[in-house]
């Protein structure tokens, strides 16, 4: 990917599979503002976010859920739901080496991108489309949705919901939560400033500025 004078590392892509196709996209800023209509649009925008070419909440993701199919994510890669039963039966007859990790529209971030200078204790809890700045640590109970993430070093032991941004040197304690925009009728995008702490099992439905502390167990 090459975008806004930045680009990912160059890699040559070769495949022996005749049913695979390498797709080249040539987008302008207008494409970023347009709703998502195809799977290609969806994956490209998610890659732009996770490669940190664009910040969360700055590109149009309308139509994302409609465009993405539900996929069986396995240790052998993505498999169509229509094919998984046959593949599982074949696996059991052979070495039984196929197992399912999830049934979801979104893959794990690390299936496609390895973020630089970031720790992720449980890769299944960070979706493709997450924006993780260098120095971020996601512990086992931490979760980061797509179109959300960190803007600096952060310790994440709670949930970063879709649309939420966490400032530099902030800490989300174990079991803490931030209200996203995907459910509950919330249209307000939540952000947390720098040097903030959400105590264990706390939560917020409002944005916080810098140097804020929310007591453990308290929901605001």
Where are these predicted regions, by residue range?
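A structural motif detector for beta-strand N-caps
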Residues: 118, 124-126, 130-132, 136-138, ...
């Amino acid at each position: 990917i090459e975008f806004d004078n930045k680009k990912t590392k160059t890699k040559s892509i070769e495949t022996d599979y005749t049913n695979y196709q390498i797709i080249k996209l040539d987008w302008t800023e207008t494409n970023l503002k347009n709703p998502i209509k195809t799977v290609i649009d969806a994956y490209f925008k998610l890659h732009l976010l996770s490669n940190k070419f664009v910040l969360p909440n700055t590109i149009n993701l309308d139509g994302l859920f409609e465009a993405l199919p539900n996929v069986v994510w396995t240790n052998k890669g993505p498999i169509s739901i229509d094919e998984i039963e046959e593949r599982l039966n074949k696996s059991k007859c052979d070495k039984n080496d196929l197992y399912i990790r999830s049934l979801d529209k979104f893959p794990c971030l690390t299936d496609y991108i390895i973020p630089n200078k970031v720790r992720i204790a449980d890769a299944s809890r960070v979706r493709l489309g997450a924006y993780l700045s260098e120095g971020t640590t996601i512990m086992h109970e931490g979760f980061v949705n797509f179109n959300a993430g960190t803007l600096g070093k952060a310790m994440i032991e709670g949930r970063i919901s879709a649309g939420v941004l966490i400032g530099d040197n902030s800490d989300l304690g174990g079991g803490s939560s931030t209200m996203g925009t995907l459910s509950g009728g919330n249209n307000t995008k939540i952000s947390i400033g720098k040097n903030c702490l959400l105590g264990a099992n706390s939560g917020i439905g409002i944005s916080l500025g810098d140097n804020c502390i929310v007591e453990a167990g308290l929901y605001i």
